[in-house]
């Protein structure tokens, strides 16, 4: 039930911590029984269950509305007549940014890591001595799963994107939409660094032609080619940013050209698209 919840935003039983009389009834009881018995018979292999769910027609549905009567008959989508649009968790969003830029360190296991914070994030900490940055720079881009979590202190980016307090049970994470989330994507130095890295990757893999660069950014970050309208708008934006490229992005090498600066800003804009942060 909880693995189903991770993929669909809601479990087959919505009260994930309560299967008793006070909890809700399952929306698909026979499906829940079938998944549970199959999971046990398969040796409790979580990856196989993920694969089974993600290959299903139900998971691969669009989140767009179908027939008008669907909304009338099942407004909460409990019967799963469409996909629930779901925002990535904080850790997954961190991973997505670094995977797109090509800097994600996918090493498994080991102790918690402590990535560097921006100056304003450090200034906001009450107990700054808790955040001792890992000495090895290669550790700074580990998966979000490995970032240090303390009971009384959370990684600021995770705090902004609704990571729960780890001192109490949390059956379902809250999903908020607040201004600090947009400000993190637009202004945080770590996102700037990854935008610069993505721009460098695109130049290396797609060459120097702007249309090819734009198409490659879309394929890396969004998993698809841009529409003709998106490609046209992105090309105009890239040309305008190149003309205006005077202020340098943080951590951009001095050798980066105006085109490189403009491309990095375009990559930053793509990181901030709703489509990048949501499973649709």
How should these model regions be labeled?
Residues 81, 146-148:
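Residues in well-ordered beta-strands of folded domains
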Residues 1-139, 158, 164-173, 186-262, ...:
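Primarily short, surface-exposed interaction patches in extracytoplasmic proteins
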């Amino acid at each position: 039930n909880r693995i189903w919840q991770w993929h669909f935003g809601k479990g087959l039983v919505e009260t994930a911590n309560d299967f008793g009389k006070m909890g809700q009834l399952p929306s698909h009881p026979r499906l829940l029984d079938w998944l549970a018995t199959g999971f046990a018979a398969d040796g409790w292999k979580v990856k196989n269950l993920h694969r089974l769910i993600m290959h299903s027609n139900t998971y691969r549905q669009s989140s767009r509305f179908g027939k008008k009567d669907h909304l009338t008959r099942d407004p909460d989508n409990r019967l799963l007549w469409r996909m629930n649009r779901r925002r990535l968790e904080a850790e997954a969003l961190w991973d997505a940014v670094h995977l797109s830029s090509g800097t994600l360190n996918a090493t498994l296991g080991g102790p918690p890591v402590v990535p560097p914070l921006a100056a304003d994030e450090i200034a906001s900490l009450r107990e700054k001595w808790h955040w001792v940055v890992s000495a090895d720079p290669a550790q700074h881009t580990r998966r979000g799963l490995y970032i240090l979590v303390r009971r009384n202190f959370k990684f600021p980016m995770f705090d902004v994107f609704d990571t729960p307090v780890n001192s109490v049970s949390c059956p379902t994470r809250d999903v908020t939409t607040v201004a600090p989330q947009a400000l993190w994507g637009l202004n945080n130095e770590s996102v700037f660094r990854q935008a610069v890295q993505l721009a460098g990757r695109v130049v290396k893999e797609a060459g120097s032609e702007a249309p090819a660069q734009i198409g490659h950014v879309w394929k890396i970050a969004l998993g698809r080619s841009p529409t003709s309208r998106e490609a046209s708008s992105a090309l105009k934006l890239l040309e305008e940013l190149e003309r205006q490229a005077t202020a340098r992005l943080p951590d951009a090498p001095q050798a980066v050209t105006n085109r490189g600066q403009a491309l990095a800003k375009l990559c930053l804009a793509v990181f901030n698209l709703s489509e990048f942060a949501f499973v649709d």
